[in-house]
Amino acid sequence: GVVTLNCARLGYQYAGNEAGLLAAVDNLVALGVDTLERRRAFVTEQLRNGLYPYTRRWLPSLDNHFSTIGVNGCNEMVRNFTHDAYDITDPRGKALTARLLDHINSLIVAAQEQTGHLFNLEATPAEGTTYRFAKEDRKRFPDIIHAGSEREPYYTNSSQLPVAHTPDPFAALEHQEELQSKYTGGTVLHLYMGSAMSDGKACAKLVRRALENFHLPYITITPTFSICPEHGYISGEHPHCPHCDQTTEMWTRVMGYFRPVESFNIGKKGEFHERQYFSETYV
């Protein structure tokens, strides 16, 4: 199971009070650990009772499986914490986020020792949670700072940079290296490109430079493309076909997988509309 912390709300509720924020994290992680332990016990019981016969054939127990604590909205946490004086792109905002992740990791180590079960810290993909957290918080706290617009609110994924921060992929890699290395579970930096790269050699060069010079666990190269009913694949973001002006179906990655933009939830559409693509010219 996965429990995700709403870091943006924490930044709002404990603005300027880091000790209070971390104390609240203590309580939330403790609640998360208790919830995940109950879930593990329930699923284990059902496994033993034969409710997962195919799983049981290959998986005698869940002892080697992790329970996960994740984070979402660290950029908005910093913005709310500082009354929008700066965000995660500022060294002070990045340092605050690093301290948060270190603190959660220490709590996870204690949880493992206490329970005897495996726990990890993950950059939760949060395909729907980025929007749901922001939507629910706006109902409770109308003046809370969020990304996107009033119509399309969302929180920035995990401890990622704001989606419109830079077109330079190496600037993003440099900023994210320290933060993403702190996760003990899943984390990835998606390099959203505005279109297909010029050729395979350019793509290979980008991947090689990224992996040789930085220590991020995972990266993806994510081009945006469009599909015309008449002319098929078109590289890049084209709401209408440049050949026949028909409405196209635009595709890009929504975290772990590619989907048509039209099927995105409201928050993810807001993120898509705000995104500044990384540029191949920096490679």
Predicted stretch roles:
Residues G1-V283:
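Long, C-terminal-biased catalytic regions of enzyme "large/alpha" subunits
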